[in-house]
Amino acid sequence: ISQSGETADVLAAIDKIKPKKAMLITNSFTSQMTLHIPLILDMHAGKEIAVASTKSFNQSVLVFYTLIKQFKGEEPKEILNYVKNLEEIKKTFDNNIPKEISKMKNVFYLGHGYDYIISKEGALKLKEIAYIPTEGYSTSELKHGSLALISDKSAVIGLSSNDSFLISCLNEVRARGGKVFFLKNKYPGGLLGALSLSRYVQLIAYYTAKELGNDPDHPRNLAKSVTVI
């Protein structure tokens, strides 16, 4: 899987194994990888100019989800709630969150299960374009290091598509002076319930970068495709 189809380490691996039975999921049908892999699936994310990939991240997960459902002979019913959640995010996004995050010295995302994966996505995007030190942790790891870093200049963003344990973790942070935010879907459910939260955390990163005067499309020191190992 490659958004650009030009990533150097993936190209090196393809050249080494010379796959005859392989599938490429990409957002570029004119890349080098398409010359070496026989089966190609388009993400249909549309052109993505920004260095920090957002649309292609979301679309790649949707492609995998749809493939798995097809292999199992099941209907991808969760997609309906996924779309509903995206519509809710458009209507309910809180612009005060980026304003508060922009004042912080460090930020942590917390989540469990699929939400933990999205916590890593949220942390990466905030680091990439807002330049704020940010990490994504599982809720079970809160007391294994990250809690020691909490101060009144720290923010913790909890992601919960279906996990009630998160509330107690956020209370631990609040008791130590940290700022807490809680993000929850209106329509919870599985992988796509968590994936819809990725849109929210990506918007937080985008508007935090804008709040700090950064160019969210062209972050410093980063390139769209890693073409040199």
Map each language-model feature to its residues:
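A SIS-like phosphosugar-recognition module
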Residues: I1-I229
